[in-house]
């Protein structure tokens, strides 16, 4: 029998919701002889206001958790986004593109680098993303850089806004 496929499950969410619940149902039922799953989050949040931590719940079902550091938004990025919103208020499309360009520099590109390194060093076979496509841009770009396929879990029919997300999501 071959070794199980190594899967990195990326969740970019900030709170426990329906996506987290469906993720747990998948993880409880997945065939562990075929899939070796490690979860990757940015935040170890609680289940509800006074519930247990995500890390505790995952440990109970034997799933490892990797927490990637969250970088605080630098002042230059906050100011640049506000200036872009003000100057480009006449064009929603240009305003969104400018804000995305700023987000790419301070938040998304560093996350892509960290995820790419994690995917390569962990010898993963697949990146599974548990949030909507528009919030998973770093996952698409990291998987592409690492040469890995992606599974995107969508609980609703997504509307992709950013051209970069659309190009990444629709690659063969």
What is each model feature region?
Residues 8, 36-38, 151:
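A structural signal for isolated positions on well-ordered beta-strands in alpha/beta enzyme cores
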Residues 12, 70, 131-132, 154-158:
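Histidine-centered beta-alpha loop that forms part of the nucleotide-sugar donor binding/catalytic region
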Residues 12-16, 29-99:
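N-terminal strand-loop element at the rim of the active site
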Residues 63, 146-149:
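A short helix->loop->beta-strand "cap" motif at the edges of active sites that frequently abuts
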Residues 118-125:
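Glycine-rich phosphate-binding loop signature in dinucleotide/nucleotide-binding domains
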Residues 2-17, 22-25, 41-43:
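Nucleotide-activated donor-dependent transferases that construct or modify glycoconjugates
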Residues 148-167:
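A short, histidine- and acid-enriched strand-loop-helix "catalytic/donor-clamping" loop
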Residues 104, 108-112, 127-146, 159:
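An aromatic- and histidine-rich active-site surface loop
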């Amino acid at each position: 029998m071959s070794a199980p496929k190594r899967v990195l499950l990326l969740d970019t969410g900030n709170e426990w919701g329906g996506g987290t619940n469906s993720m747990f149902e998948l993880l409880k039922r997945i065939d562990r002889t075929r899939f070796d799953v490690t979860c990757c989050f940015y935040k170890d949040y609680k289940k509800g206001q006074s519930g247990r931590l995500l890390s505790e719940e995952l440990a109970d079902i034997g799933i490892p958790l990797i927490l990637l550091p969250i970088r605080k938004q630098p002042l230059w990025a906050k100011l640049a986004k506000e200036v872009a919103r003000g100057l480009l208020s006449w064009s929603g499309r240009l305003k969104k593109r400018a804000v995305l360009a700023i987000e790419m520099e301070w938040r998304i590109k560093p996350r892509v680098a960290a995820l790419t390194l994690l995917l390569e060093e962990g010898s993963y076979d697949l990146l599974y993303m548990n949030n909507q496509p528009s919030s998973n841009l770093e996952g698409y770009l990291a998987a592409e850089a690492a040469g890995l396929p992606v599974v995107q879990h969508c609980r609703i029919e997504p509307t992709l806004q950013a051209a970069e997300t659309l190009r990444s999501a629709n690659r063969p």
